[in-house]
């Protein structure tokens, strides 16, 4: 079958930021009626590539062609006018405006010089329906929507612009499984309608399910383009990281013997979201928290960290009952707990501030003397963490917003490690980062556990739970219904427990 000519092509594209090369002689060709996956580690050049496509930044060298004619975009508005629209990983919605206002914000329908509210609502309803999100009310305020629904509004906003080429940058990373399926259905429909689509994701199974063509980027260069399905996952990952990809997860230690738990929960409950949570964790253990998304896993972490009010039940630290009324209590010296949040950009980092400031602010007591920051002590602490986490940054005084997503996530982790926590809570810490950085985080977690930390690790990725965790607590409807250990930690048992289906072992509430 003869392939159609590319709708959009980039040839020899290069971009530098100061002395740093973001793209070097990059090429890519996007065809109509096809989904083109762009793969690469964080920092490989993908974000710069799509920013150039979308008119956010201009290339230093190279050219772009649309319908065979050379073009240049002075702004995102110019790219939109040419039919190129991007759904960025960072949401562009205005929280205090309605869904409908956000969807038409770049080109509101007018009548007698004023916004035509009836037509605006109709446009919003059509865009939401096309995105598979007709359950979202156009009049709802964006700030009242959960993150996954905001992402669906972002996609609807892009569709309302009637693009010829739509770019999706990690568009499913914040979505529920139900919304992911709706997005997949939408993308397949748009492909059948002849739209050109660029799909960026670190989730290999999504690429396998959706893509027609793939291009791999590494260190700012386009390494190889190939038809989807012609390479194994391992071959693709090796193209992305430039080395052999094996031993993704570090080996698990042998049974450590009986050690007194560092943390115990007894019948922890909170409203209708948590019920009867009971478990122990010992120093050196990595305990996974699994189950379908939204079964109380995040609430469990927030309850342990003192964020939630009116939590019932008992938390015991080192055999002594404690009261966790606030994160300050959880972080205190006697408890020494840390929570790595889910959303690094809104909950984990202060993006306009420097890497140094983000790290130091979490541990002022450690790096201060008589109320004044000891710059030498601060530098020693930061240098140690940079080495431990292999953080890539030109300088610690650069804005943290300028780092790649993977390095931003490392800074979030480093920020909490500044206080040397004994108990580490992680809320889906590898969401939206590349496979190489994920592997580094897995190694770090095992290293921290081997040094005596107790780690509670919530993940929506079954492979992570299987590969990283010594035990897995599976949650359903706010309760722990199953504990998996050893050979039981496999995909079949995890899925069965997540769906509350009794497998070889009857589902039961866990008691230590």
UniProtKB/Swiss-Prot annotation:
Q: Which GO terms describe its cellular component?
A: plasma membrane
Q: Which residues bind ATP?
A: 40-47
Alphabetized UniProt keyword annotations: ATP-binding, Cell inner membrane, Cell membrane, Membrane, Nucleotide-binding, Repeat, Sugar transport, Translocase, Transport
Q: InterPro entries per the record?
A: AAA+_ATPase, ABC_carbohydrate_import_ATPase, ABC_transporter-like_ATP-bd, ABC_transporter-like_CS, P-loop_NTPase
Subcellular location field: Cell inner membrane
Enzyme Commission code(s) on record: 7.5.2.7
The record's annotation in CDD domains points to: ABC_Carb_Monos_I, ABC_Carb_Monos_II
Q: PROSITE patterns, per this entry?
A: ABC_TRANSPORTER_1 (PS00211), ABC_TRANSPORTER_2 (PS50893), RBSA (PS51254)
Q: Which domain of life is it from?
A: Bacteria
- List the Pfam families hit by this protein, alphabetically: ABC_tran
Q: Which reaction does it catalyse?
A: D-ribose(out) + ATP + H2O = D-ribose(in) + ADP + phosphate + H(+)
Query: Where does the record place the ABC transporter domain?
Result: 8-244, 254-502
Report the enzyme's class at the first EC level: translocase
Q: Which GO terms describe its molecular function?
A: ABC-type D-ribose transporter activity; ATP binding; ATP hydrolysis activity
Q: Write down the membrane topology.
A: Peripheral membrane protein
Family per similarity comment: Belongs to the ABC transporter superfamily. Ribose importer (TC 3.A.1.2.1) family.
Its quaternary structure?
The complex is composed of an ATP-binding protein (RbsA), two transmembrane proteins (RbsC) and a solute-binding protein (RbsB).
Protein task? Part of the ABC transporter complex RbsABC involved in ribose import. Responsible for energy coupling to the transport system.
What's this protein's name? Ribose import ATP-binding protein RbsA 1
Organism encoding this protein: Rhizobium johnstonii (strain DSM 114642 / LMG 32736 / 3841)
């Amino acid at each position: 079958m003869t392939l159609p000519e590319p709708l959009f092509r980039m040839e020899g594209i290069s971009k530098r930021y100061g002395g740093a090369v973001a793209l070097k002689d990059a090429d890519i060709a996007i065809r109509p009626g096809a989904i083109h996956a762009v793969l690469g580690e964080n920092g490989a050049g993908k974000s710069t590539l799509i920013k150039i496509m979308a008119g956010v930044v201009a290339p230093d060298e190279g050219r772009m062609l649309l319908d065979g004619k050379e073009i240049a975009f002075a702004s995102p508005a110019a790219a939109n006018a040419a039919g190129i629209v991007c759904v960025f990983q960072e949401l562009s919605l205005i929280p205090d405006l309605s869904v409908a206002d956000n969807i038409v914000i770049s080109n509101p329908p007018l009548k007698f010089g004023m916004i035509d509210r009836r037509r605006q609502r109709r446009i919003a309803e059509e865009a939401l329906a096309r995105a598979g999100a007709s359950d979202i009310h156009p009049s709802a305020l964006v700030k009242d929507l959960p993150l996954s629904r905001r992402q669906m509004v972002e996609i609807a906003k892009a569709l309302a612009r009637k693009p010829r080429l739509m770019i999706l940058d990690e568009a499913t990373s914040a979505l529920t499984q139900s919304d992911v399926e709706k997005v997949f259905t939408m993308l397949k429909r748009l492909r059948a309608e002849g739209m050109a689509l660029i799909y960026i994701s670190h989730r290999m199974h999504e690429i396998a399910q959706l893509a027609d063509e793939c291009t791999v980027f590494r260190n700012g260069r386009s390494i190889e383009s190939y038809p989807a399905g012609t390479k194994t996952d391992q071959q693709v990952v090796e193209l992305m990281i430039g080395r052999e990809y094996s031993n993704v997860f570090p080996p698990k230690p042998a049974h450590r013997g009986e050690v007194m738990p560092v943390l115990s929960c007894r019948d922890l409950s909170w409203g209708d979201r948590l019920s009867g949570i009971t478990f122990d964790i010992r120093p050196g253990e990595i305990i996974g928290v699994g189950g379908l998304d939204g079964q109380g896993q995040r609430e469990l972490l927030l309850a342990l960290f003192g964020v939630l009010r009116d939590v019932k039940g008992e938390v015991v630290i080192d055999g002594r009952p404690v009261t966790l009324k606030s994160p300050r209590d959880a972080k205190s010296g006697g408890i020494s707990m840390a929570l790595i949040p889910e959303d690094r950009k809104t909950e984990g980092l202060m993006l306009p501030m420097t890497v140094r400031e983000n790290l130091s602010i979490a541990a002022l007591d450690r790096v201060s003397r008589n109320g004044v920051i000891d710059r030498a002590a601060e530098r020693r602490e930061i240098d140690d963490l940079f080495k431990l986490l292999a953080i890539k940054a030109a300088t610690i005084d650069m804005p943290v917003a300028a780092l790649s997503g993977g390095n931003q996530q490392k800074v979030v982790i480093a920020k909490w490690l500044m206080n040397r926590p004994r108990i580490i809570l992680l809320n889906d810490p590898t969401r939206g980062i590349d496979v190489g950085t994920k592997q580094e985080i897995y190694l770090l977690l095992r290293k921290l556990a081997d040094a005596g930390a107790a780690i509670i690790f919530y993940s929506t990725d079954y492979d992570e739970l299987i590969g990283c965790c010594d035990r897995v607590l599976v949650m359903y409807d706010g309760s722990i219904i199953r504990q998996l250990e050893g050979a039981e930690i496999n995909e079949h048992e995890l899925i069965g427990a997540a769906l509350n289906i009794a497998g070889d072992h009857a589902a039961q509430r866990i008691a230590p």
